[in-house]
Each structure stands twice: as C-alpha cells, then as structure tokens.
Amino acid sequence: MTDPQQTSMGSPTWSRRNRLALAALLPMLALAVGASSFRYATIYRPTTFSQGQISSTASQHFVASESFGEVTIRRDVTISLTSIATDRAGSVTAAPGTTVHFVELAFAAAPEVPLTQCVIELLDADGRVFGTAGGKVTTGTVRDATAYPECTPPGAPGPQLDLDGTVLPPTGTPRPTSWPVTATFAMPAGVTPVAVRVHWGPPHFAQLPL
C-alpha cells in the first residue's frame, strides 16, 4: 500500500509546478492595474472656419489662440499681399482646362511665434475654396514643389509643434522678423479668385482681398 504522506512529499504541488508562470504573471497584473488608473483626455477640435479675421485692405494683423488639451498656442503675425500673377514662366504650367495663379505674400512675426504647418487657399466669388495641390504640370521629372507651401522661410522655420501641441524651441538659423511666401494655385479656366485665405486649422483664419 502506498503511504499518502510519501506521495504528497514526492509530488510537487500546483504552485511549485507553475511558479515560473506565476512569476511572469505578477508584473502583467501590476501593469494592468496601472493602466486602469491612467487618465485619458479627449481633445475636441473645431471643424468649421467660424472665426475669420477678414481684411478690406492688402494687409491683416492676425492674432489667434488655440488649445491642445492643456497647451495653448498663440499666433501673432502680419500677412500682406504683395502681388498676384497668372501663368508666368517657370517650372510649373497649367494643366489643360486650368489657369495657374501665383500669389506673393509677405509675413512678419516675432521669431518665437510658431507658424509652421499653415494652409494657403484661394476663394472665388461663390465662396469655393481652391488649394495649392493638383492641376499643375511640372517640367520633366520634377515633382510639384509648390503643392504644399510653407508660411516660414526655408531653413529657418522658427518654433515647431510636437504631436501634443507643445511648442518646441527653434534650432539652427533664427527666423527673420519678415520674409516672402509664394503660393501657386491651379483653378478652372474662367474662374477668377477674389480672396486669399491663410490658416493653421479651424476655426480661425486670415483673409485678404485680391
């Protein structure tokens, strides 16, 4: 007959057989508890351009603030229309059925103001909006470098934004206090632009007449 005490002593218990699995499980339980107590924040962003700063002259002093959670960004910049030309000679020509418009702007702002990731658009008399991408034929194999213009000078963008809206300090060459910006548009032939709009996302925008 088998001695029950001997059987118990000779066979490892369940906890002993699975001690490695238990040891690996404990850190996972700690992470799960920590994740359950993590505070999530939902950021709601406006989707319409409801707060326009519309000028009746060729210049607009644009001042606007926007919030990314607990981070607030303030933009303070003067935007001026320098000139507008149609189908001038260059590396970009109009695709069939379109007309290319070249808009020259001048920006002026303190070097510490974040101005990257802007959007420049044209509007017609019906309020239709036209962007800078598409409708243009480039020379040879050159890509359309005018599709997404920046509102900052090349090599000196000034402060940039992190994914959470945090303003990152500028690196490299300091941004000047004023500089030119060129935006190139292709619009349907026969459509006349009446205004240029500059923004960094809704709801705020600056608008100048042409």
Q: Which residues does each PLM region occupy?
A:
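Conserved functional micro-motifs across diverse proteins
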Residues: T2-L210
